[in-house]
Amino acid sequence: GSSFCDSKCAVRCSKAGVQD
């Protein structure tokens, strides 16, 4: 969700398995 994973950490969150 953009409220949790903004454009800056989208890749990091993706690698961490965190839903955007």
UniProtKB/Swiss-Prot annotation:
Keywords: Allergen
Tissue-level expression: Expressed in pulp (aril) of fruits (at protein level).
Protein origin, superkingdom: Eukaryota
Family membership noted in the UniProt record: Belongs to the GASA family.
Protein name: Pommaclein
